[in-house]
Amino acid sequence: MIVTTTAHIEGREIASYLDIVSAESVHGINVVRDLFAGMRDFFGGRSQTLERALKEARIQATNEIKERARQCNADAVVGVDFEISMPAGRGGMVVVFATGTAVRLK
């Protein structure tokens, strides 16, 4: 399954646009457990805890849009867009939304 952020796939022609596919992935970040590591990461300029949660959420959302595209008998998903949200008051949660268009290729 080809998944791309571009509207086209080089060297391939889109035969039909099947459906919009989307997925959400929510991951919790254990802020208390990672407090000291988080402080070190923060002062170093990066939070490995947050980066790890974002990466896992993005991978999960990508896998879900692939599965939804397979259910449409698609060959690829084009125009994939990721949005990231960290809901206020939710105690260290990361939400990744993935959206794209399932297509059949010639």
UniProtKB/Swiss-Prot annotation:
Q: Which cysteines are joined by disulfide bonds?
A: none
Q: Which domain of life is it from?
A: Bacteria
Which family is this protein grouped under?
Answer: Belongs to the UPF0145 family.
Q: What is this protein called?
A: UPF0145 protein PFL_3418
